[in-house]
Amino acid sequence: MACNPDFVQYIIDQCSGAGEIAVKKMMGDYCAYCDGVLFGLICDNNLYVKVTGPGRVVLKEVILRSPYDGAKDYFYISDVDDREYLTALIKATIPALPKPKAKKNPMK
């Protein structure tokens, strides 16, 4: 089942206090980025955040789930209505994740 665009926009709005939130559509679901760092997935109208130690400390409830068959476990976020909670979770998670690699210029 693909994500509802209204739900995706709701998640973007709810997480916006953490930084610049962007999403990229991939096969009906979305990768979620904060300030250019991939922090989670939006799949089947659910939010999943990458597992990190600092993120685990902030979580109200630790639920590990795979967003789709064959994927690593992510933190499943059941409370997407608490904007302050989501902001704190993402702000704690981002520094623990690898920064995106600079794109190389193709050789001519």
Language model: regions and residue ranges:
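Charge-dense, helix-prone N-terminal extensions
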Residues: M1-K108
